[in-house]
Amino acid sequence: MTSQLFAVFRREISVERAGREALVTTVPFVAALVVLAGLAFGPSPRDLAVTGPGTAWLAVLVATIPLSRTVAGTEVAEDSWDALRGLVAPGALFFGKLLAVWSGLALTWLLAGGLVVVLFGVPVPPQSLYGGAVGTLALAALTTGFGVLTASGARRRGLLAALLLPAGLPALLAGTQLASAKVPVLPWAVLVTLYAAVVLVAAWAVFPALLEE
């Protein structure tokens, strides 16, 4: 299973390098959202300091929508999705896709957070790194599951925003609080950890059924 997992992950990275679909759709969107938010909330440094962490996490949450379309979109377009899910074990396919999406969301979080630090002048507390790692993992599990669920039909893809955004709210809230100054760390760290564990286990458990859709 491990060899299949990393084979799927390497394939995802190779596909992204060749097409740069996620890069082209995500980076300009995140940059535009952060810049526009800075213009809307500014120019008061106090207002920017309050809204900065939430802006970064909102960008990450909304970025799950275009990223979810890349989970199985290439295989469906090439008519290779049926062959892939027939040859690769469901667990290996899930975790290989998950690692690829997690990498994309982690880079998105780093980009959004870096822009917020530069443009908003918001410091980075140490606990925000934990929130970023665990929160993006939870969102990656959601994105992988919903990406596979909606890959087989155009009508289903229209439901992505309605499914992903509400389901990702705990990561948005906990990540924002962990990136904010003078906020109790432990309750939010526990929340994002439990949320990530529940989402990861649930997505893994239902993934074989999603492959049959």
Protein language model annotation of sequence segments:
Residues 20-42, 55-64, 163-174, 194-202:
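Hydrophobic alpha-helical transmembrane segments of multi-pass membrane transport/permease proteins
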Residues 118, 196-213:
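Junction motif at the cytosolic side of a transmembrane helix
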Residues 129-165, 211-213:
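A structural motif at transmembrane helix-loop-helix junctions in multipass membrane proteins
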